[in-house]
Amino acid sequence: MGKPIVAIVGRPNVGKSTLFNKLAGKRISIVEDTPGVTRDRVYAQAEWLNYNFTIIDTGGIEPENNDVIISKMRRQAQVAIETANVIIFIVDGREGLTAADKEVAQMLRKSKKPIVLVVNKIDNMKQENYIYEFYNLGIGEPISISASQGLGLGDMLDKLVENFKNEGNEDEDSEYIKIAFIGKPNVGKSSLINKLLGEERVIVSDIPGTTRDAIDSYLETDEGKFLLIDTAGVRRKSKVKEEIEKYSVIRTYTAVERADVCILMLDATHDISEQDEKIIGYAHELNKAIMVVINKWDLVDKDTKTVNKYKTSIGSSLSFMSYAPYLFISAKTGQRVNRIFKMVRECYDNYCKQIKTGILNDIIGKIVMMKEPPVVGNKRLKIYYVTQIGTKPPTFVFFVNDSKCIHFSYRRYIENQLRDSFDFTGTGIKLEFRERKE
């Protein structure tokens, strides 16, 4: 499989957020001011025994009365079942076994997903006896922890990564370019996938957030082999708006995590929204190849300036990813749909692009000659050598005299010049500056 996804499920106040933050190694409710990235993060990267994995917080909105706890837990468990490779089911050792715990355990058992049962708030040896009643859940041996004190987390993580070893891998999918179709409900993601597949494979409805499971579809074309990932719709019966949005974000994030290329779908009949910016912000932050598809183009009154007006309007909202190409389509009529795989292929090839070191240094030499670095703190930046150290996205290391001398405007100048010299349409590029050891 790719990077494993771990979902944390549990009743309100059992310690989900405490465990989430402890595994992430920091408090992450407020994140860095990266353009286009939501501040209400529901995911984080973690590592144990050389296993890198993603943890998902399914906490949602905590209900204020007991009447809605069980229905909320059902939704929470369903999201975990849909999106995660392994589930951490956390219960409260002090409070003991509850009806909500039993019902969710039954759902999790039926899913056949690997489950790690964690009994939290066991702060000392005297409280170890609290864990035994949780054997009745029938989902394996409970592991006692204290998330707040960090006790027992090593044993829990050992058990967790054992499940990674047992999980199947996605080697059979490695020859496929994975495409995630992301966007708000009802922008036409499922309609487009059906048009590309030539069959009614994904449930399509005019109701935003129509209930459906995430579906992977395999397709071979002249442009290559593709795996299409549709982001599952949110549960339309939920009455809690914030909870709907959070679960939708979780589903979208897991699709983005798996993808090579993300297609942000927008509705031509609506302005770009903050939710659109958040959705594509995930893909940008995770360094995925990105393209923007504007659907329902057949419903727009057009003249010769309409396309440029749309590009300008969208570009002002998505300025942090100006590298993404645009395609105006109609999934309903099929207008320009046949161009999608060609554009995906171009974005993916640029995402994997490797520049020879000699050519790269020749270009950088010319870039510096055209515009000398500014003086920063009485010192001028000197670039000794450049090499590419990675792809997906292309990543370049500059060996310099003093990494503190790189001004943000000159960094941007270098990136723009590299883009002018090499085609990086559809992909971000990363520039790192390291001081050369004498």
UniProtKB/Swiss-Prot annotation:
InterPro entries: G_ENGA, GTP-bd, GTPase_Der, KH_dom-like, KH_dom-like_a/b, P-loop_NTPase, Small_GTP-bd
Matching PROSITE patterns: G_ENGA (PS51712)
GO biological process terms held by the UniProt record: ribosome biogenesis
Any Pfam family hit: MMR_HSR1
Amino acids binding GTP 2: 183-190, 230-234, 295-298
Molecular function per GO: GTP binding; ribosome binding
Iron found in the keyword field: no
Family of this protein: Belongs to the TRAFAC class TrmE-Era-EngA-EngB-Septin-like GTPase superfamily. EngA (Der) GTPase family.
Protein name as it appears in the record: GTPase Der
Native source organism of the sequence: Clostridium kluyveri (strain ATCC 8527 / DSM 555 / NBRC 12016 / NCIMB 10680 / K1)
Taxonomic lineage from the root: Bacteria, Bacillati, Bacillota, Clostridia, Eubacteriales
Gene name in the database record: der
